[in-house]
């Protein structure tokens, strides 16, 4: 015989949908409002563990982990967001908030100061520092830069370190400037002693998942970062992505439980 707790377990594991949960809860004596509230509570409590298997429509052998030249293909975006964080990010309400920066401040919208967040480790164990952030911004500047957002960041006049702060001087005031630092082309990567990125293709980041294997245009696998600094994120033990360009094949893979989700339905 079913109980409310049994129904919660089935709903949390995905074995029944929200409608079935509410109908079952009402049948057991709960009011519709109470059943709806319980379903929302279960949905708001993520279950940790397991491996997310994702089949994606787009991906080629030219896919790379250097997001500065990403074409915006689904595969590159999924891999990039799994691996990297930015200096700032866009919150759910559309506002720009600090990410790898602990604070963000400006008095005139021309000089911007970003304090490096303490306690953040790269996937290789190195601690995040201001040189990493400085090298990551400069990677999009200069005649030799191939970055897709080189033009948008041309308004930067100077980038320097001031203790634990990254200081960015603009040619003129721009209150919207931080938005550019949240772009998927502009993740923070490891800098070297010469002020340049150590290896933009290495796929070493600070985000929730550590790259395990990468076969461009074919597949990739990740394991959860045990030292991820963001609480309440990265719930899966691992992620596996596979490129399946044929829509029918993607749907068949989903229906036969070969994957957990697909894109471009």
Where are these regions (language model features)?
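C-terminal segment of N-terminal export signals and the immediately downstream linker at the start
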Residues: 15, 36-60
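Short, well-ordered beta-strand elements
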Residues: 49-59, 111-114, 133-136, 166-168, ...
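Gly/Pro-rich hinge or "lid" segments in bacterial periplasmic/extracellular proteins
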Residues: 92-95, 182-240, 246-248
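Aromatic- and charge-enriched surface segment that lines or borders ligand/interaction sites
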Residues: 102-146, 167, 253-256
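Paired acidic/hydrophobic, glycine-rich loop segments that form the ligand-binding mouth/hinge
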Residues: 259-264
